[in-house]
């Protein structure tokens, strides 16, 4: 039994939190891009 396996153990909650933060950031970015596009379309109609 070496030290290898114990080093690779990560806290599952940390992994989940990391994924959640990434997902939220990605969603915010997409929303912002859609908002910018909508604003451009709106301004071109005036």
Curated annotation (Swiss-Prot):
Pfam families: CRF. It is found in: Secreted. It comes from the Eukaryota. One of its GO terms (molecular function) is hormone activity. The modification Isoleucine amide is found at residue 46. PROSITE patterns: CRF (PS00511). InterPro entries: Corticotropin-releasing_fac_CS, CRF. Keywords: Amidation, Hormone, Secreted. The keyword Electron transport does not apply. Signal peptide: none annotated. GO terms for cellular component: extracellular region. Belongs to the sauvagine/corticotropin-releasing factor/urotensin I family. Regulation of fluid secretion. Stimulates primary urine secretion by Malpighian tubules and causes a dose-dependent stimulation of cAMP levels in the tubules. This is Diuretic hormone.
């Amino acid at each position: 039994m070496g030290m290898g396996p114990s080093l690779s153990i990560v806290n599952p909650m940390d992994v989940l939190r990391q994924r959640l933060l990434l997902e939220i950031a990605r969603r915010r970015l997409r929303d912002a891009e859609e908002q910018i596009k909508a604003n451009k379309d709106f301004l071109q109609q005036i």
